Amino acid sequence: MEVVEILKELLKFKSITPDDDGAMNFINMFMDGFDADFVDVNGIKNLILTKKFGDGVHLCFAGHIDVVPAGDGWDSDPFEPELKDGFVYARGAQDMKSGVAAFLCACKDATKFNGTLSIILTSDEEGDGIYGTLEALKFLKSRGNLPDFALVAEPTSSSTFGDTIKIGRRGSVNGVVTINGVQGHAAYPEKCVNPVHQLASVFSDFAGYELDSGSKYFGASKIVITDIRGGMEVVNVTPKSVKIMFNVRNSELTSCEDIKRYTEHIFNGFDFTLSLKESSKPFLTDESSKIVIQAQKSIENICKISPDLSTSGGTSDARYFAAFGVPVVEFGVVNDRIHAINERVLQSEVESLYLVFKDLIENFE
């Protein structure tokens, strides 16, 4: 079956995170000739497919089969793919069943390869993302079979197919600062300790502050305020406390400890508490890595353009490969309609993505 037909079959599965809706079984049957391991954790389905061609490098393709809910307002059934004007319309068309279809077909058709090809698929990426790719990699490590290189087929292209490869991602740290005061009557401010006034005195040194100046592939790590709450929504009572929520998308130059240290410095002298949660660490694959160089060459061979190397965007499962020391890149179709109503992907992009992956496999040594 050609790659677009496989994509259409995958799009029929109502695999709203974390349910795979049977997609994993379909993929396992389609990929005959590959050894299969189902790694199911806490109700999450993960599938690892492996085929050894020779004693060379182990190259892994990875992706997720789960999608976000479709919502209302679609022009067609979001789980009945429709081909119109060269586009395939359905939930998951761009994010990321197109990438999955492309690497499934490229791996299935592979003949010229002197190593091991593997595929990691999960139904837990759009949700919590903690029982998916991470667990699959733990399983492979326990078997002594971690890949040497990996490609995650997320939709990375910005405006033109082939224009962007992701070679890293910023980290993400969420924080909550609560300043405690003394509640009282607004007419007697001298008898109160107003935490909002305390916040106001330091707010300009906290909101939007750049913790570093960035680097070649990362912008500055900036404190972004996401919410401020305090008081009882009445005009004559001062607040007992004020809560400030913030997020930092951090580069490799700023750690969670650095964020903690700066926040404590700013609010020093106040009665406050601080809670930080690091949901992902920043990572960067060296631009001289074999996976980066060969991905660039394959894109240039098929797309006739030179892709930019980028670390923009949110978090992805590529971070788990980096955590295990596996050099990883991300590459896929244009991402202009991900998570949107009437999500769609160009049929020609899916076909070209298959050719890029096929070229990568055939020329990877």
Curated annotation (Swiss-Prot):
UniProt: Zn(2+) 1 binding residues: H64, D95, E154
Listed EC numbers: 3.5.1.18
CDD domains on file: M20_DapE_proteobac
Known pathway: Amino-acid biosynthesis; L-lysine biosynthesis via DAP pathway; LL-2,6-diaminopimelate from (S)-tetrahydrodipicolinate (succinylase route): step 3/3
Keywords tagged on the record: Amino-acid biosynthesis, Cobalt, Diaminopimelate biosynthesis, Hydrolase, Lysine biosynthesis, Metal-binding, Zinc
Cofactor binding, note field: Binds 2 Zn(2+) or Co(2+) ions per subunit.
GO MF assignments: acetylornithine deacetylase activity; metal ion binding; succinyl-diaminopimelate desuccinylase activity
Pfam family, one: M20_dimer
InterPro entries (UniProt xref): ArgE/DapE_CS, Bact_exopeptidase_dim_dom, DapE_proteobac, Peptidase_M20, Peptidase_M20_dimer, Peptidase_M20A
Superkingdom assignment: Bacteria
Cofactors, names only: Zn(2+); Co(2+)
Catalytic reaction list: N-succinyl-(2S,6S)-2,6-diaminopimelate + H2O = (2S,6S)-2,6-diaminopimelate + succinate
Location of the active site: D66, E125 (proton acceptor)
GO process annotations (BP): diaminopimelate biosynthetic process; L-arginine biosynthetic process; lysine biosynthetic process via diaminopimelate
Residues that hold Zn(2+) 2 according to the record: D95, E126, H339
Broad enzyme group: hydrolase
Complex and partners: Homodimer.
Function: Catalyzes the hydrolysis of N-succinyl-L,L-diaminopimelic acid (SDAP), forming succinate and LL-2,6-diaminopimelate (DAP), an intermediate involved in the bacterial biosynthesis of lysine and meso-diaminopimelic acid, an essential component of bacterial cell walls.
Family indicated by similarity: Belongs to the peptidase M20A family. DapE subfamily.
Protein name as it appears in the record: Succinyl-diaminopimelate desuccinylase
Name of the coding gene: dapE
